[in-house]
């Protein structure tokens, strides 16, 4: 897989659909190499031969499947992810390491999402902007949408790096505006926001 540069410190290996594998963020922080997610399947990691610090966005297999196949110095995970993969240091609050900021990110996609802000310029958010699916609807938890907006507003990075999104980069302010509009469509007595698919 080809490594795609975002800037001089940040690049990524593009995810695949078959087999399903998430994008893998690569961050050069001083002498250390960091990965945001590790993908799934041999093809995803064929050129990752070093030793890495890892932040896992969440526990789904397409983001964590290669954990046992890489040389990992340390891994930062949510409590939910640790429950599933049985390894890593739980990041249940903001953690700052050099120019990196690891942060919990509320999400309707699944419990236990983590983001990674780099140099206050880009923030990896994994699948946290996505919803669950039921019947013909995208299902968002209204409170989690509100909480995610609050977290995103506190970030300094103007750009978000979103897994499974072509080109990865989204403008943070545009995402906040979309989530704010979504939140305004919540029902008065329902904890869910339902959006018709298609």
Give residue ranges: language-model regions.
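Conserved beta-strand hairpin/beta-sheet module of binuclear metal-dependent hydrolase folds
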Residues: 1-47, 114-130
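Extended recognition/assembly regions associated with phosphoester-bond processing machinery
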Residues: 100-101, 170, 197-198
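Active-site environment of divalent metal-dependent phosphoester hydrolases
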Residues: 20-21, 42-43, 59-66, 82-85, ...
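Residue-level marker of motif borders
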Residues: 4, 53-57, 104, 122, ...
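Active-site HxH/HxHxD metal-binding segment of metal-dependent hydrolases
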Residues: 16-17, 40-98
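Short, flexible loop segments at the rims of nucleotide/cofactor-binding pockets, characterized by
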Residues: 11-17, 33-39, 53-56, 100-106, ...
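Metallo-beta-lactamase
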Residues: 4-8, 32-33, 69-195, ...
């Amino acid at each position: 897989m080809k490594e795609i540069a975002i800037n001089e410190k940040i690049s990524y290996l593009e995810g695949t659909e078959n087999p399903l594998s998430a994008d893998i963020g690569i961050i050069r922080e001083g002498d250390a190499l960091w990965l945001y997610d590790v993908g799934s399947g041999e093809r995803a990691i064929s050129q990752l031969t070093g030793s890495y610090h890892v932040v896992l966005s969440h526990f789904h297999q397409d983001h964590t499947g290669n954990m046992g196949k890489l040389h990992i110095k340390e891994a930062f995970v949510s409590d939910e992810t640790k429950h599933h993969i049985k390894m890593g240091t739980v990041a249940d609050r903001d953690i700052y390491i050099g120019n990196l900021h690891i942060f919990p990110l509320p999400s309707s996609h699944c419990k236990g999402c983590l983001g990674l802000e780099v140099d206050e310029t880009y923030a990896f958010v994994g699948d946290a902007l996505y919803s669950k699916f039921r019947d013909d609807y995208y299902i968002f938890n209204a409170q989690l949408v509100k909480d995610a907006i609050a977290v995103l507003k506190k970030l300094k990075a103007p750009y978000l790096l979103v897994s499974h999104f072509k080109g990865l980069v989204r403008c943070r302010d545009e995402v906040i505006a979309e989530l704010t509009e979504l939140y305004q469509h919540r029902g008065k007595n329902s904890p869910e926001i339902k959006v018709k698919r298609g």
